[in-house]
Amino acid sequence: MTDDLVNEYAPAFAPFFGFAGCAAAMILSSLGAAIGTAKSGIGISGIGTFRPELIMKSLIPVVMSGILAVYGLVVAVLVAGGLSPTEEYTLFNGFMHLAAGLCVGFACLSSGYAIGIVGDVGVRKFMHQPRLFVGIVLILIFAEVLGLYGMIIALILNTRGSGN
């Protein structure tokens, strides 16, 4: 292979897209986790003054929101592991890592928004009707799975980008 061909497929700016994917995975998934935590926390603080014994059961949406940031962290670490200043990094790998970061980031962002809304309203209604607990948890699981789908696609993309 000639140097011209290597430079054509691995330009100097290719790692930028990998770093952007790493940043997108962490920033967007953390933003989703923060939105879910904040919106759910508002509902929890609202019921805490009336029924303090329900606070521990009401923390489920907050915990589920925190898991979203872990999904982004996993993908960001894997993408960062594929970046090296001494090895050739192709434009294909850069775009693949960018796509992986955006997949998990936006999936976790939307998942966090859904968890926040369901958590806020669900916790407030749970205070009045405790039988709603199982239904609320099921809806929260379905919202959480959206972020998991994004992480699965990001892991598949990362595997393809590593040249395996």
Swiss-Prot record:
Residues 37-58, 119-135 are cytoplasmic. It is found in: Vacuole membrane. CDD domains: ATP-synt_Vo_c_ATP6C_rpt1, ATP-synt_Vo_c_ATP6C_rpt2. It holds the Pfam family ATP-synt_C. The keyword tRNA processing does not apply. It is a multi-pass membrane protein. One of its GO terms (molecular function) is proton-transporting ATPase activity, rotational mechanism. InterPro entries: ATPase_proteolipid_c-like_dom, ATPase_proteolipid_csu, ATPase_proteolipid_su_C_euk, F/V-ATP_Csub_sf. Gene3D superfamilies: lithium bound rotor ring of v- atpase (1.20.120.610). Residues 1-15, 80-97, 157-164 are lumenal. The record marks E144 as: Essential for proton translocation. The keyword DNA repair does not apply. Belongs to the V-ATPase proteolipid subunit family. V-ATPase is a heteromultimeric enzyme composed of a peripheral catalytic V1 complex (components A to H) attached to an integral membrane V0 proton pore complex (components: a, c, c', c'', d, e, f and VOA1). The decameric c-ring forms the proton-conducting pore, and is composed of eight proteolipid subunits c, one subunit c' and one subunit c''. This is V-type proton ATPase subunit c'.
